[in-house]
């Protein structure tokens, strides 16, 4: 099982300081739909792991989130890709749950659900907490510089997990993965 986990806000869609609260505010990052299509076509299972504390803060509802995710699914399919599952944490930091990144609960659940190997699983995110969550299970962290990624790199570059790879966009990450898949293997 080849699994890639994507953070949502700032990676797949544009992020907002005041939360993405509705389907109209959910706007894809340029190239992200094609990136998911490339990953799908390369044989990867693609899952989304997203903290959505706006639900816990009552900024939007689960129904609003469902509508945003329906739009994301539709646009990804139109590009020729597939998202095989979406996991979200509705809690705030004060709830002290195990699913809110950087805690690894959501990531462990995804890896278990797809019977994947943590050490072979990528997580692409734009925040330190995304990278810490995949690092906690022994996976492969990738930072993209969209969303909060540039700020994360400048303010937390010294704290990134040791094997973090940095890409400008999700599309750049997907092209790297496709090159890795087509590179000749050593005997």
Curated annotation (Swiss-Prot):
Keywords: Carbohydrate metabolism, Cytoplasm, Hydrolase, Magnesium, Metal-binding, Zinc. It comes from Neisseria meningitidis serogroup B (strain ATCC BAA-335 / MC58). Mg(2+) binds at residues 7, 9, 126. It comes from the Bacteria. The record marks 100 as: Contributes to substrate recognition. It is found in: Cytoplasm. Gene3D superfamilies: HAD superfamily/HAD-like (3.40.50.1000). The active site is at 7 (nucleophile), 9 (proton donor). The keyword Magnesium applies. Monomer. Its cofactor is Mg(2+); Zn(2+). GO terms for cellular component: cytoplasm. Pfam families: Hydrolase. It catalyses: D-glycero-beta-D-manno-heptose 1,7-bisphosphate + H2O = D-glycero-beta-D-manno-heptose 1-phosphate + phosphate. Its EC number is 3.1.3.82. Its main location: cytoplasm. Pathway: Nucleotide-sugar biosynthesis; ADP-L-glycero-beta-D-manno-heptose biosynthesis; ADP-L-glycero-beta-D-manno-heptose from D-glycero-beta-D-manno-heptose 7-phosphate: step 2/4; Bacterial outer membrane biogenesis; LOS core biosynthesis. The record marks 50, 101 as: Stabilizes the phosphoryl group. Substrate binds at residues 7-9, 15-19, 50-53, 100-101. InterPro entries: HAD-like_sf, HAD-SF_hydro_IIIA, HAD_sf, Heptose_bisP_phosphatase, Histidinol-phos. GO terms for biological process: ADP-L-glycero-beta-D-manno-heptose biosynthetic process; lipopolysaccharide biosynthetic process. One of its GO terms (molecular function) is D-glycero-beta-D-manno-heptose 1,7-bisphosphate 7-phosphatase activity. Belongs to the GmhB family. SUPFAM superfamilies: HAD-like. PANTHER family: D-GLYCERO-BETA-D-MANNO-HEPTOSE-1,7-BISPHOSPHATE 7-PHOSPHATASE. This is D-glycero-beta-D-manno-heptose-1,7-bisphosphate 7-phosphatase. Zn(2+) binds at residues 89, 91, 97, 99.
